[in-house]
A protein has these predicted regions:
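Long C-terminal interaction/binding lobes of large macromolecular proteins
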Residues: 1-237
Length: 237
């Protein structure tokens, strides 16, 4: 005799970058097991694949995970996690005042939003009608390149992966980065002067991020400090 099937609740959310409404469900025991095994391995590729698989399954395979900006995937996963194991996450955060003591806090995951920096734009004017149109890093671009976060050592690789278009004459002439070699893109980026390069960096600094400010109290010094959590890893510290 077949065993009865349990009813799984469904919820709705808006994808931050598009405002598109999608339905999702909590992850099940079999999916939680996949995530736990990936977390135990501490391999970035395993964790990324687990997050992708869970988001895909829990959104009923209705979204194209590989093409989504990283912050969209992180936000969706956070919502799935909050409905699966609880809206409150217990965190241990390093206190900024002495940089050695940890404070335990309860964070309501439903309060965490994707935030965009001031004056953010994906169109970067360089000179004389020439410029770059940028696109956001995807979870796949990070995974394939082995990049965990954006820093000085990998900035050129990240930039070249996120160029959507290079244009001249105010857009009358355009170049598709897919038609260029990696070296050609790197050479182009290295031609930028300091001011132009800072404008490109600003795109990444101000782009949408899973972000939340929280005040923590050092249990030893009793000093209160503001801590900014960014990216999925910070919310499960």
């Amino acid at each position: 005799m077949a065993l009865p099937k349990l009813t799984t609740p469904t919820y709705e959310l808006e994808i931050p970058s598009t405002d598109e409404k999608i339905k999702y469900r909590p992850f099940l025991v079999k999916e939680e097991k996949i995530l736990m095994m990936a977390m135990e391995s501490k391999e970035n590729a395993d964790i990324t694949q687990a997050v992708k698989d869970i988001v895909s399954e829990c959104t009923f395979n209705k979204v194209k995970i590989d093409d989504m900006p990283m912050f969209d995937v992180e936000y969706i996963f956070l919502q799935i996690r909050s409905k699966s194991v609880g809206e409150v996450s217990k965190l241990k955060l390093l206190c900024p005042d002495d940089k050695k003591t940890y404070a335990e806090i309860d964070l309501n995951l439903t309060e965490v939003k994707v935030q965009v920096g001031e004056d953010h734009t994906n169109k970067i004017e360089l000179e004389n009608g020439m410029g770059i149109i940028m696109t956001y890093p995807t979870i796949d671009s990070f995974s394939k390149s082995g990049i965990k976060d954006i820093n000085a050592s990998n900035m050129l690789d990240v930039i070249s992966n996120c160029i959507l278009q290079i244009y001249e004459k105010n857009g009358e002439k355009t170049y598709d980065p897919k038609d260029q070699t990696k070296k050609e893109l790197t050479d182009f980026i290295e031609q930028l002067n300091t001011k132009q390069f800072k404008e490109v960096q600003k795109f990444f600094e101000t782009m949408p991020k899973l972000k939340h400010d929280i005040t923590i109290k050092n249990p030893k010094t009793k000093k209160e400090s503001k801590v900014t959590l960014t990216g999925l890893n910070d919310f499960f510290a």
